[in-house]
């Protein structure tokens, strides 16, 4: 095993000798079966999941309730142990607790102590990471400004709206300046303005070189910010690839042009040039993520165990 000293606390961490720093998360035949009281298989929550999440991308996990999204997140955090297969996170086995020093996590519900202020809440989490007082103070101030809660930083969280609580929850997930951020329904409870601001913050994290994995039922949000997505259904991976590639309608071509006479429109490229027209773009038209998602779910219901023909686990980032 190699030794990694890049953790915030400076502790030594063991990493896989074959670790590729450009692969932040790797699931290999990852399976989770929940058993009943007698140890008998009850629910196959995740079935032989194989995927890679690359450094610096925003990756979306999509699926209806019971599809295995939350189970996947808990396996990556080490809160659950796989029945078979394995997950590597930042070069370490996901069951290694030390890797969590380099991870930020925003759960679907932010369980924060309601009688603390925003400043006190973030200071508490900074202490958990053994951050020095001066560094902690600067980091708390920076994060409160980043999530736009400076005006409410000394109010107790019990006075916060759901949207404000989500923002301070995001700040809590970022307190340790993590390399990997896991977000479960990050825009839940936010109004349209708050949703836009949250998406802008997620995009900024990518610009800073961080890797973001987000679960969401709000498909428009995923379409807006994610580079690649995985669609799960009843524990099976149904689709994997870049959002822009998955949404292309492959058997159609769309041409957008300006300054064209009616005659020029009929003959496309040659006539466009001959008549002085300007081609704006020639590309495959796209569906939207909601239609793609619903089509995959319907196909999965009609053909259990089938994975969509267009799935591409090797899409370039």
Where are the model-predicted features located?
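Conserved acidic
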Residues: 19, 214, 285
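Short, charged/small-residue-rich alpha-helical element at the C-terminal edge
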Residues: 243-317
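ABC-family P-loop ATPase nucleotide-binding domain
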Residues: 1-40, 300-317
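Hydrophobic alpha-helical segments with strong N-terminal bias
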Residues: 13-16, 75, 199, 232, ...
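ABC transporter nucleotide-binding domains
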Residues: 22-27, 32-227, 231-233, 239
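Generic marker of residues within folded, mature protein domains
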Residues: 17-20, 116, 245-247, 272
């Amino acid at each position: 095993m190699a030794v990694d000293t890049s953790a915030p606390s400076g502790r030594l961490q063991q990493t896989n000798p074959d670790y590729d720093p450009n692969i932040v998360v790797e699931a290999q035949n990852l399976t989770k079966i929940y058993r009943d009281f007698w140890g008998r298989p009850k629910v196959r929550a995740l079935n032989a999941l194989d995927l890679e999440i690359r450094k610096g991308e925003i990756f979306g996990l999509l699926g209806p309730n019971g599809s295995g999204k939350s189970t996947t997140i808990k396996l990556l955090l080490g809160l659950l142990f796989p029945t078979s297969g394995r997950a590597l996170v930042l070069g370490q086995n996901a069951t290694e607790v030390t890797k969590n020093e380099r991870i930020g996590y925003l759960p679907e519900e932010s369980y924060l102590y309601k009688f603390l202020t925003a400043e006190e809440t973030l200071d508490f989490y900074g202490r958990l990471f053994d951050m020095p007082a001066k560094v902690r103070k600067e980091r708390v101030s920076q994060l409160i400004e980043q999530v736009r809660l400076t005006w409410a930083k000394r109010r107790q969280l019990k006075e916060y709206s759901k949207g404000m609580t989500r923002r301070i929850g995001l700040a809590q997930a970022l307190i340790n300046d993590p390399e990997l951020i896991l977000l479960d329904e990050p825009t839940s409870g936010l109004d349209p303005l708050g949703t836009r601001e949250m998406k802008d913050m997620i995009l900024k994290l990518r610009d800073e070189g961080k890797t973001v994995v987000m679960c969401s039922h709000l498909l428009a949000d995923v379409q807006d910010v994610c580079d690649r997505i995985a669609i799960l259904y009843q524990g099976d991976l149904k689709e994997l690839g870049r959002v822009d590639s998955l949404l292309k309608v492959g058997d159609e071509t769309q041409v957008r042009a300006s300054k064209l006479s009616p005659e020029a429109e009929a003959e496309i490229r040659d006539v466009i040039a001959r008549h002085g027209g300007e081609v704006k773009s020639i590309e495959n038209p796209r569906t939207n993520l909601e239609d793609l998602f619903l089509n995959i779910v319907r196909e999965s219901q009609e053909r259990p165990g089938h994975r969509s023909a267009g799935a591409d686990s090797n899409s370039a980032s």
